[in-house]
Amino acid sequence: MAWYDNAVFYHIYPLGLCGCAHENDGQPTPGAFEKLNAWAQHAADIGCTAIYIGPLFESGSHGYDTIDYRLVDRRLGTNTEFKDFVAQCHARGQKVIVDGVFNHVGRDFFAFQDLKANRENARYKDWFCDVNFWGNNEYNDGFSYGNWGGFNLLVKLNQRNPEVQNYHYDTIRFWVDEFDIDGIRLDAADVLDFDFMRGLRRLANEIKPEFWLMGEVIHGDYSRWANPEMLHSVTNYELHKGLWSGHNDHNYFEIAHTMRRLQGLCHDTRLYLFSDNHDVERLPNKLRNREHIRHIAILVYTLWGIPSIYYGSEFGIEGKKEWGSDWPLRPCLELSDYKDAVNTNPVTSVYAALGKLKAQLPELTWGEVKELQLTTQCYAFARVLDGEACVVVLNNGDSPAQLEFQLPVEASAAKDLLADTVGAQPIMTGIEWGRMKVQLPSNYATILKLEK
């Protein structure tokens, strides 16, 4: 068992959370790492055992236009402060992973500055893709070049160049030696060179035990990236889409089909599960019925994978993209505004309870997933391990529903594990002749522990 197999991640976008300037003016945000450490402690309090923080390193604007891979963004603080942050997380038992933006760099990156200054004679011209000295761009460089997503702000690196590969490998060694990080989330992994990622995996196996590589992949066969030769995991965007649209459309078949399909492709690989992140709108802005936030939180924690929370989502905050800007998805928040949320906010309460259950019940991590009942509006499945079972029951309909299914293990009673959460509703269960009946209120979900 590796640490990431039973991890619960808390995702922090630090430039947003700390209220940093959107364009890098070189000025530190007072108390940034003190604030980040307080949020990491909060994450531990609700059961998160790992912190994914990023982008973190010196950039010109949003963090993904890297200027210096080995210098913490001056808007946040210093290398020493980040080193202390990691040490404090480790003291709490939390692992720390950072963003690795290896596909592209910002225009102020040293090698691109050399290309601008020296053109055909540039020492580093082969570090970049599709350089054309007969072309031009909106910056009037007098040449054109490959980029990410059509944005010339993000200059594409040539990952097949051994010098570029070794530069990135040395950067990772620096991050481990200097900061003692535990893994990397690879930005834009779906356009990274596969041989480069194989090299990353070999390096990961050498530099630190259980060093974790997780890639940002949107579409496709995830097993092409997540496999024993390349990455340990990838972002499960396919399930992310199903989580909100399956509830909006009252269609649990979409979620169940997605999980079956991914199990067929990826087998026991644990994909990174999320309901929202720094690139997509928050659940309250996507769901037609916000009561379904509870359902989605339960699914993220109980389906096969690695659950995560994006900062602020445990409070049910909103976040909607504006034209040309993702900053509304990455807000500055103050913990003091939510100091009693676990006792008053239904969303916070259920996330905190799920964190405790994940730590207490091994079947939620290691148990086989057994589908028990599936309709468009009702879904029941179990996590079964060594004769123990938790049963997840969900109703996305506007009317109460009765579920009935075969017991996955022998049992005589069932305990509602989320009965004490804020906003919990009473449910009725009955067991007879190896079958179980559950009466669920409308738009409600919970987890039942089967008892002998």
Residue ranges, per PLM feature:
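Solvent-exposed beta-strand/loop surfaces of large extracellular or lumenal domains
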Residues: 415-435
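Substrate-binding/active-site clefts of carbohydrate-active enzymes
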Residues: 1-9, 13-49, 56-178, 200-206, ...
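A structural motif
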Residues: 48, 180-181, 305-306
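Active-site-proximal helices and loops of the catalytic beta/alpha 8
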Residues: 90-92, 116, 177, 187-267, ...
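Hydrophobic faces of well-ordered beta-strands that scaffold small-molecule active sites
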Residues: 8-11, 51-53, 96-98, 184, ...
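C-terminal beta-strand-rich structural cap/linker in extracellular carbohydrate-active enzymes
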Residues: 430-452
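Loop/helix patches that line or flank the sugar-binding groove of alpha-linked glycan CAZymes
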Residues: 2-6, 24, 28, 255-412, ...
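Active-site groove signature of glycoside hydrolases
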Residues: 104, 168-194, 273, 277
